[in-house]
Swiss-Prot record:
Disulfide bonds: none annotated. Keywords: Coiled coil, Host cell membrane, Host membrane, Membrane, Metal-binding, Zinc, Zinc-finger. Residues 568-585 have a biased composition (Low complexity). The lineage of its organism: Eukaryota, Sar, Alveolata, Apicomplexa, Aconoidasida. The keyword Metal-binding applies. It comes from the Eukaryota. It holds the Pfam family zf-C3HC4. This is Trophozoite exported protein 1. It comes from Plasmodium falciparum (isolate 3D7). Residues 178-210, 271-301, 544-601 are annotated as: Disordered.
Amino acid sequence: MSNKKRSKNENDESTSLPLENSELLIEYIHNLKSCLNVYRREIQEKNKYISIIKNDLSFHECILTNVNVVWSVFNNDLLNLLCNNEQKEEGEEIIKQRNIGDEINEYNNLTKLQNDENIKNNNMIKEDLEDDANQNILMKSPYYNIENFLQVFLKYINKKKKKVKVKVKDEGKKEKIEDKKYEQDDEEENEEEEEEEEEEEGEEENKEDEEFFKTFVSFNLYHNNNEKNISYDKNLVKQENDNKDEARGNDNMCGNYDIHNERGEMLDKGKSYSGDEKINTSDNAKSCSGDEKVITSDNGKSYDYVKNESEEQEEKENMLNNKKRSLECNPNEAKKICFSLEEKIGTVQSVKLKEYNELSKENIEKNKHDDNNICNYLSHNEGENVIEREDKLFNKLNNKNYRNEEEKKKNQINFDYLKKKIKNNQDVFEETIQKCFLINLKKTLNLINKIMYLKNVEFRKYNLDYIRKINYEKCFYYKNYIDIKKKISELQKDNESLKIQVDRLEKKKATLIYKLNNDNIRKHILDNNIKDYQNGIDNSKVSYFDEGENPYNRNNKNYRTDNKNSDDNNNNNNYYYNNYNSDDNYNSEDNEYNNGNYRFRNNYKKDSLNEDDVKKNPLKVCHKINSDSNIFVNFENIITKQNIIHSEPFRNLLKESNELYITLKEKEKENIILKNEILKMENKKDEEYEHLLNNTIEDKKELTRSIKELEINMMTCNMEKDKISNKVNTLEYEINVLKNIDKNQTMQLQQKENDILKMKLYIEKLKLSEKNLKDKIILLENEKDKMLSGIHIKDNSFNEESKSEEGKIQLRDIQNDNDEKYDDEKKRFKELFIENQKLKEELNKKRNVEEELHSLRKNYNIINEEIEEITKEFEKKQEQVDEMILQIKNKELELLDKFNNKMNKAYVEEKLKELKNTYEEKMKHINNIYKKHDDFVNIYLNLFFQARKNAILSDSQREEQMNLFIKLKDKYDIIFQKKIELTDILKNVYDCNKKLIGHCQDLEKENSTLQNKLSNEIKNSKMLSKNLSKNSDDHLLIEENNELRRRLICSVCMENFRNYIIIKCGHIYCNNCIFNNLKTRNRKCPQCKVPFDKKDLQKIFLD
């Protein structure tokens, strides 16, 4: 919370919150607790990340320390070899100048000094081993365990040398039997000492065998040996003190050879020389193996040194066989150790199994070479085992007091002989050690190169920006590919639907073309109609009235036949009307019209004329002709099919239908062109789609190689993105929640202030009402007292004047009025008292609510303060985390700088230059590979970007094609809509034709009715003809009536009376005919062809 909010809360301490919002506060508190839990989880996650980073740092430190340890050991070993060679060269020059006696004295002095120095070195070793840093360095070297190699190498040699010691002891016993005369007193003491030594050596041999077996069973040998070295150094101090006492008591010609490691580790007398040891000798500078003591005696005999050659050869062969048998199994066990160490490397560095197999093969070959070197070395060191026997004899003879000058001379000769042997053996030993260490250097270089390669690979994997770019581009390209597929599928569906519609339209088109262009069918129909008319004319010649037949029935028969013909003609003419096309058919129509008129007339002649009647009654015939002619004149204007065909509206309809047919043909051509274009576009799209598919397949093959390597990084990036997004979302949600909380709190405070002000005003009003009520109560009580006092006075006065009854009545009335007033005032008082109690209860409740709200406000302030403290702590922890990350980065940089400085130091000796050159060549080769890989990556990126550009271009082209296709589709839709409109117009034309046909049928029915009327009128005329003489005047009246009726009937339909007049021309027609012309938009007068509108019409009333 800010200071402003605190100041508001402090100023508003008097205000109180209602109980309704307490639930909201509880919810807010719950939300704050959840937020705190979220912050704690985030802090835990950050601590986890920090621990992971620390582990990575420790791993890199381990690598650096291992490399430093290995290189320091090998450098020290090589320096030791160089120093030994220099000392040898100096020693050879000194030997020529000095005598043997001086050498022995100087050697004894050196041994004393070396013993003192060894004690000091042992103390230093203890201090170093106590340090944790040195222990960690030694514990963290799994790549090449030098001390393990050293122990195994020494134990091979020690076992075989102990066998030789046993043989030397047996020979010593034989010599003691020969010298019993001279050594009776000393022999007993020596036997006891020898027995003790045998027991100790037997125990040591068993222990060493067990340890040697454990070296090949357990892989944690190195760590166990480091723990043993501490206890081992303590025992060394005791042994050295004992050696000092023995050196003081014994005047040896050649003292003990003391061997110490350059790193400060002392070696037992039971251990032999390895590569990292210094050999301190006398001024002769001759070096021995680690457990050998070169001792000569004055009393020694020459036969101890000069033996038969056959015995020496047998002993050599036996030793070699035993040593070879012991080493047959050891190489495989040593190889197992190497494999186990390499597997440890693989677990740390996550190297593949294939690499391990390759390493194992190389190590097998190298170990074979090492084993052969060791065997050669042991074969050369057989002479040293012979010297051990002579050493022990020499120790025994030193304890004796008798020494002769002759024996001294022999010892001097033998000493020179031994020196020569030691030189030869030592040269071979140094060569084997050099070979061993060169092999070990190659191993370490291979491991270092692999470590460097692994670092480069990991650096590439953790290049997150590069991975994000590739993932983004891949997702973008894949989304576009899916969108294109969806669009293509949708277009295919639309294309199929359009094909179906096109097929339907083609079918309709075929039907329309068949109906519109088939003129032969129309001509055939016309020819059939003409033949029918001719047959009708031929049949009209037949007599109309036969004997025994009623003329009425005959007329009906003719009427039925005519109706049948008319129905047939209607069926043919329906097709004819719909398919009528050109103006060339008007001649045939005129012929049909004339034939129709001719038929009509002949039909009426059938009814009227007959040859027999002419012969019999010529007067009647004349009368019939006149009457028929009059009737024909009356019905000439009857509407027939021919009149309809020749009418102008029908011709206009035909013209419009021709125009529509022409437009349809044009639009069909356009549709065909558009279809061809659509097919071309589809073919192009299919080709492009196939091309794109081929490109994508090729790109996939190239991308899968890189995607397999990048999938792991994608997962890591996605996990990081999800975590970051979740964090951002949580923070945004928390910010929004806090903002909403602030807003709600401010709104609540404002509402509460308003409510409190209202409550204060209401309380003041209640207080005023209380005061007024109290005043009223006091006044009422005073009035009551006055009334009671007046009543008592009146009672007394009325008692005195009780005689008068009128006064009593008045008193009673007054008392009743007073009682009523008193009761009313009591009721009011009670009501006011109840209201006061209610108001007091409400005030108490409000006070309690205010107290509760005050407590809640305090709690809320406390919670806000806790939240502020938590946020501050969270910010501090974030700062600490950032500082830790910076420190870790700085440490990484420092370690890398140290590593680079150590690797870039110049090597001291010329022999390592060759190794440096090989290493530089390998690094160059690795850098070239790395450059090639980078070039390949750049090429791949360029290809990927080119493919992406091609995809974008293809997308743009496809979009353009889609736009063209959409435009063509819109045009096609417009044409299709026009076609639909034309079909609607044709339907309307067909409907109009149907209506006209129905109308024609109605007219035919009316004709039939008129024919019936005519037949009746003919009958009447016949009757009238008989009475012509009598009723000639009536005939004239009938004729006049018919003429007048003809004038009143409409000249178009010949059915209805004339109702409407056209003002422009003055012609009169019926209602139906005029409005039919208006509906068909033929707004012209049928007779004079003058145009008119509805405004030009006017109704006429003849009645």
